Amino acid sequence: MSADTKTQRLIPMGVLKGAHGVRGEVRVKSFTADPDALFTYGPLMDEAGKVLLTPITARPGKDHFIVRPKENLQKEDWDALRGCLLHASRDQLPEADEDEFYFEDLIGMPVYTVGEEPEARVRAVQNFGSGDLLEIEIPGAPATIYVPLTRADVPVIDMAAHRIVIPELSLWANQDEDDAS
């Protein structure tokens, strides 16, 4: 693994679903909005940056793609990799439109309320089944808080200025304290 691979940001783009038959093909589920786009990002890697799958060809299956990979593994080897996430390097993805963003790009962004000084930062973007949530770290707070990633709760995500505005951040922080009592 090169030094570049160690520092690159990897984005989960799909998942291996195991072997397809005995001729070396594999089943892959795409997470991308345009499922075919998964195969335009070059070799797909595991979370450590090691190349797992270099697609040569891909054809649609029922809820997945059947891929002929460059890698020559046995059926049992591909089946052992079932469930492994396939990542692409962030720099391989197209730039988001002006009013769009990648969740990965929100991580580490400062969070403002009304002032000019950041009051928190985004630790992660989570989804526990009921919608996307920003996991927010507030300096000195005992735990992170979760804020729904909606226009009502997060009215400003300014990628150019590298800032997120959550005017009611204190309400979310206080809600966690209310739940504990």
UniProtKB/Swiss-Prot annotation:
Keywords: Chaperone, Cytoplasm, Ribosome biogenesis, rRNA processing. One of its GO terms (cellular component) is cytoplasm. Binds ribosomal protein uS19. This is Ribosome maturation factor RimM. NCBIfam families: 16S_RimM. Its main location: cytoplasm. The PRC barrel domain binds ribosomal protein uS19. It is found in: Cytoplasm. An accessory protein needed during the final step in the assembly of 30S ribosomal subunit, possibly for assembly of the head region. Essential for efficient processing of 16S rRNA. May be needed both before and after RbfA during the maturation of 16S rRNA. It has affinity for free ribosomal 30S subunits but not for 70S ribosomes. Residues 98-172 form the PRC barrel domain. Belongs to the RimM family.
